Amino acid sequence: MTLFHFGNCFALAYFPYFITYKCSGLSEYNAFWRCVQAGATYLCVQLCKMLFLATFFPTWEGAAGAYDFIGEFMKATVDLADLLGLHLVMSRNAGKGEYKIMVAAMGWATAELVMSRCLPLWVGARGIEFDWKYIQMSIDSNISLVHYMAVAALVWMWTRYDLPTHYRLPVTVLLGLSMYKAFLMDCFVHMFIMGSWTALLLKAVITGVLSLSCLTLFVSLVHGN
């Protein structure tokens, strides 16, 4: 039963990535090693972020249950490095915009999945007692994939030299929302004392709205040109 539960969690977390890679056409472009390079860039960026946070934002010691809004906001600002990393990955790849976006998003999201969820699933999902948090973790990995696709598309649009002026503001706003999404989620969860499933649903809704808005801008920009 424990192995069956682990298999379900593993399939729920990893198969959408495999299906996306196959159905997006990346496999036809032999983009596997490009995705690996994007994943390696993700690791370097996260290492730099950890060193920066450990140096300039040490652990805040406040009252029990208190939430340091200003400190967490400043820490969320460090996620700007992710946007720079995605831009670096896309700038090093030649090809159409769709190809650059998919390579960067797949490599980035897969690296995050392997580094942050592989070990917890292997250790926890094989435990004797069933726990919903591993199902939630697997679902959250799919939300992260959609999130990074939207962010990569926004970064690609924002860095275009021929981006029309009237696109600049909405793209910038969406980039800001994507960067501070985790911080806003933590604020909502803390203020309204949300349960884990409610928080996951809220994250899915916010990511969906962000992604649909990004898709609308991307399609209108590409077909407009």
Curated annotation (Swiss-Prot):
GO terms for cellular component: endoplasmic reticulum membrane; nuclear membrane; plasma membrane. Residues 22-34, 91-100, 158-166, 219-225 are cytoplasmic. Keywords: Cell membrane, Endoplasmic reticulum, Membrane, Transmembrane, Transmembrane helix. The chain crosses the membrane at residues 1-21, 35-58, 69-90, 101-126, 132-157, 167-189, 197-218. It is found in: Endoplasmic reticulum membrane; Cell membrane. It is a multi-pass membrane protein. GO terms for biological process: multi-pass transmembrane protein insertion into ER membrane; protein localization to nuclear inner membrane. One of its GO terms (molecular function) is ribosome binding. Residues 59-68, 127-131, 190-196 are lumenal. Its main location: endoplasmic reticulum. Belongs to the TMEM147 family. Component of the multi-pass translocon (MPT) complex that mediates insertion of multi-pass membrane proteins into the lipid bilayer of membranes. The MPT complex takes over after the SEC61 complex: following membrane insertion of the first few transmembrane segments of proteins by the SEC61 complex, the MPT complex occludes the lateral gate of the SEC61 complex to promote insertion of subsequent transmembrane regions. Component of the multi-pass translocon (MPT) complex. This is BOS complex subunit TMEM147. The lineage of its organism: Eukaryota, Metazoa, Chordata, Craniata, Vertebrata. The gene is tmem147.
